[in-house]
Amino acid sequence: MVTYDELNEQNDKITELTNVLEHLLGDRHLCGSAVTCELFYRFVEEVKNHLEVMDKGLYSQLLTHQERQVRNTADRFMGGSKEIKRIFAAYLKKWCRPKTRELAIKEYDQFMAETEDMFELVLNRIQAEQENLYPMIRKVTGDPQRAVA
């Protein structure tokens, strides 16, 4: 069972980490600090976990719904999830050293541009979930508290 409170809590954590990381990574001297790297990898884990919860639980009930609009919305969000995962994986491969949990920043300006794009992508996704997906699921299921039974 997944509740809207749990999904919103995940989204709040991701948003908070994004906001903090934007400030820390904005200072070139703090990019390689242990604290920044720890928060960055926590952000990565939170995003991956959230997408996994969404992929495994929410879409199946929507994809079989009788209304085409519901199925199309679920399909769009699933496609968006795949695209975010693809972009995220390429970003992590380029800028991260997962074994040592460090950032591999060779070109700071390029790193920051790609990081800001990635943060924007994730935050836009969260906003779309809260404004479009969750209300639709509430309407379809009639359950104001549980997104997935």
Regions found by a protein language model. Name each.
Residues 1-149:
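Small-residue-biased structural context
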